[in-house]
């Protein structure tokens, strides 16, 4: 059984342990995912602290937290796709080139949204909870 204290670290370690692509072409993708895993880890620590001390802040951030978690998980899945794509590339170049291009789009256009979600969420809940409707 994993305590809630270490859950984010367990996931981060699992993802990093599974990233064992040796192809040099994968390095930019791995670097991107590691960077965003670190943001997820900071966000997880922030959420754990806010759940204890400021539940409204945690509530206000939960949607963004789930987005970040989902994007990191999708990046992890794309790395697995890339591992196969680089290995099998010569057997079906057109097919695997499409996979690599789609991964490139995801890692450069979609995954960076994590930063925005993290920054937005960690500003606190005042902008949500204290909004005055007219």
Predicted regions and their residues:
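C-terminal amphipathic alpha-helical interaction region
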Residues: 14-134
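Single conserved hydrophobic/aromatic residue that forms the stacking wall/gate
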Residues: 1-11
